[in-house]
């Protein structure tokens, strides 16, 4: 084999040596660099979404924010530049990896600061400034990831890679906790909240996160540059500048074609009526391949025109790929790429839908946060350390096999979680003297069709259901609705399902909803379209496009009320008419375990045909099953992830570390994430139990693929 190839070996170290490997200086370096890598991602996604939400802005309103994610998805596109381009002064002073790492970290601090000094509530200009900061943060954070991955691979031999991957992952998770939960706690401590937006709180929170990045900068400055034998290249400065220009135009072609290709895909889907998940996946794959082809064509044309040194362009973009196929041969290289693209498919596809799944099982945000963010993170780290430990004692391919078995088999535990609740009886919807029966699915969703003529004869539906094994648990819920008339009307929907607020519910904000009919939103006062009143206190409610209004009231305020009665008031513009509706409620110590949530019914017209009434039976599922499922799933994912990172690292050539690993890591998540985008559609069609069974079965071919790759690699190493 060429000397630049990393060979996977079978370790025979003792357990003591395996444990002490985690205290190696290189492992500690990766812990701190992992922390630095874990800070930015949540500042772009979840924490930013909460900030924008408190400022009264939907993140989706600015499509520019979606570009921030492109940096992570397509980092392999500019990874060759990171491998090839020297940084004036810094490369000679710090070395190739540390120079780029320092630049990336400084850009991250700058990007976070740009976001901190942007108040989205002040208007579009400030919102675009924040979007620019988010995009810069996405690309600079992805650049940091490229360099850290290359640094890790060059820092130690293959046998040590699982240890480095484990400590890197531990640092990454800690960084995510600081930027996620830590940022939210700090913002809340500084006083901001939903309905009480304070810009300075978010400003100082983001500046604090920028300050935390100094840990990464200090680490970069005090560690040593990896010693790697590389072929010295001597090109003119102008050659490098021209290379950057060609790269810029190629990337611009890729990004533009990928973004605008979405419009073409939408037109094709609409015109041909494509709804099949696999057909949609094929379209998305063609969109990605087409964008890559356009970038490649644009780059090739510029190279042929002499816009850049041809030899330099070949060494930058073609050599890394050619090297991989040259070292492993076409057959083995293609099989390796197949394994890389599909190894994590089972757990990534199930992971995409996980938060929605937990919510569908009626677990609270607090329960989900505790289970996922605390126990999930802890056992993911334990799984990573276990993977690193076993890698010192096992052949990496055997460990990959164990990881693949666990990653897919643990999805079966989620079927147990779905089955942990009581079986439900029929849902009976009664309108006047007419009854309609529905069978709820495994998470309680149900729907019935009721003729509008029947609904027009009443103003309320009655819904009752029970546990299939205990009819004494029957629950009866009423929901009022409006009949469409020419005159304006307003009414309040039940506060909770039955106007009863439990002591547990009173600990959080309660959303009060109601409906308007006979008027449009434009006819209401702009600043306060609907006001909710309770004991003289006023709370502003927002009105959506369906004329359903909603406003949040603190549960403690509802609990302390003397009247226990909410009034909704709508003031019409240029009109003295005021619409009012009242709704009393009661306090109870606790509520029944069985409940029914019914979606608001739009105002009824007698001649509109059948009306679809939807709802959800809310029952309790085992919290013990929830914690067990999350613990074993994250333990398996952590172990499989550590083994897989070590495997990917072993495939890279020292001459093209950054490029090859960036390609591998992007390929690792690209296919599963594209398929994962259709998880919701699949669940709707087949339900959760069959979905998790499907994700388990998907993992079986991967086991054969791991065995096949292991056999081919053994044969290859004998050559």
Where are these predicted regions, by residue range?
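C-terminal ends and interior cores of transmembrane alpha-helices
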Residues: 101-124, 406-423
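Helix-to-loop junctions at the C-terminal end of transmembrane segments
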Residues: 76-93, 383-399, 683-684
């Amino acid at each position: 084999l060429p000397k630049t190839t990393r060979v996977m070996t079978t370790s025979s170290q003792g357990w003591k040596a395996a444990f002490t490997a985690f205290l190696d200086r290189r492992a500690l370096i990766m812990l701190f660099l992992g922390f630095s890598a874990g800070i930015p991602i949540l500042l772009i996604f979840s924490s930013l979404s909460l900030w924008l939400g408190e400022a009264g802005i939907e993140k989706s309103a600015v499509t520019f924010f979606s570009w921030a994610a492109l940096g992570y998805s397509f980092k392999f596109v500019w990874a060759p530049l990171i491998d090839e381009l020297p940084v004036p002064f810094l490369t000679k002073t710090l070395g190739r990896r540390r120079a780029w790492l320092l630049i990336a970290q400084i850009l991250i601090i700058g990007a976070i600061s740009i976001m901190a000094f942007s108040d989205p509530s002040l208007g579009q200009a400030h919102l675009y400034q924040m979007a620019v900061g988010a995009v810069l943060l996405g690309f600079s954070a992805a650049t940091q990831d490229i360099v850290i991955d290359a640094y890790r691979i060059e820092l130690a031999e293959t046998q040590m890679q699982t240890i480095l991957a484990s400590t890197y992952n531990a640092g990454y998770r800690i960084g995510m906790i600081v930027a996620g939960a830590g940022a939210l706690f700090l913002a809340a401590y500084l006083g901001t909240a939903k309905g009480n937006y304070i810009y300075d709180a978010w400003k100082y929170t983001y500046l604090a996160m920028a300050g935390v990045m100094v840990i990464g900068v200090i680490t970069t400055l005090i560690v040593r540059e990896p010693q790697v034998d590389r072929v010295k290249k001597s090109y003119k400065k102008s050659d490098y500048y021209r290379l950057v220009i060609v790269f810029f135009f190629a990337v611009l072609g890729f990004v533009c074609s990928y973004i605008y290709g979405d419009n073409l895909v939408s037109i094709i889907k609409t015109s041909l009526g494509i709804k099949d998940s696999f057909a949609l996946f094929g379209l998305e794959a063609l969109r990605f391949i087409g964008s890559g082809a356009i970038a490649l064509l644009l780059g090739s044309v510029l190279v042929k025109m002499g816009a850049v040194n041809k030899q330099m362009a070949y060494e930058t973009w073609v050599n890394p790929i050619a090297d991989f196929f040259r070292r492993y041969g076409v057959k083995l290289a293609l099989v390796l790429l197949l394994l890389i693209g599909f190894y994590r498919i089972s757990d990534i596809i199930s992971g995409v839908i996980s938060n929605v799944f937990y919510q569908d099982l009626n677990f609270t945000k607090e329960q989900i946060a505790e289970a996922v963010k605390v126990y999930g993170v802890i056992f993911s780290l334990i799984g990573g350390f276990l993977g690193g430990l076993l890698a010192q004692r096992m052949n990496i391919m055997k460990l990959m096999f164990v990881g693949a078995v666990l990653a897919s088999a643990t999805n079966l535990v989620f079927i147990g979680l779905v089955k942990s609740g009581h079986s439900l009886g029929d849902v009976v919807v009664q309108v006047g003297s007419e009854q309609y029966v529905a069978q709820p699915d495994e998470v309680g969703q149900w729907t019935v069709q009721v003729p509008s003529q029947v609904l027009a004869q009443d103003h309320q539906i009655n819904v009752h259901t029970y546990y299939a094994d205990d009819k004494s648990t029957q629950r009866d819920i009423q929901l009022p609705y409006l009949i469409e008339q020419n005159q304006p009307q307003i009414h309040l929907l039940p506060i909770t399902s039955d106007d009863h607020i439990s002591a547990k519910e009173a600990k959080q904000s309660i959303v009060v909803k109601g409906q308007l009919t006979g008027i449009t939103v434009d006819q209401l006062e702009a600043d306060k379209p609907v006001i909710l009143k309770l004991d003289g206190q006023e709370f502003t409610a927002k009105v959506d496009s369906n004329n359903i209004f909603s406003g949040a009231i603190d549960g403690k305020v509802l609990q302390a009320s003397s009247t226990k009665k909410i009034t909704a008031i709508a003031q019409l513009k240029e009109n003295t008419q005021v619409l009012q509706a009242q709704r009393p409620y009661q306090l109870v110590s606790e509520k029944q375990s069985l409940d029914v949530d019914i979606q608001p019914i739009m105002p009824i017209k007698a001649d509109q045909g059948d009306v679809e009434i939807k709802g959800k039976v809310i029952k309790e599922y085992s919290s013990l099953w929830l914690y067990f499922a999350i613990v074993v799933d994250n333990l398996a994912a952590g172990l499989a992830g550590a083994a897989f990172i070590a495997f990917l690292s072993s495939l890279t050539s020292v001459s093209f570390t950054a490029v090859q690993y960036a390609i591998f890591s992007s390929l690792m998540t690209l296919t599963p994430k594209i398929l994962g985008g259709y998880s919701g559609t699949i669940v709707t069609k087949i339900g959760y139990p069959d979905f998790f069974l499907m994700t388990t079965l998907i993992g079986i071919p991967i086991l054969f693929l791991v065995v096949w790759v292991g056999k081919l690699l053994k044969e290859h190493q004998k050559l």
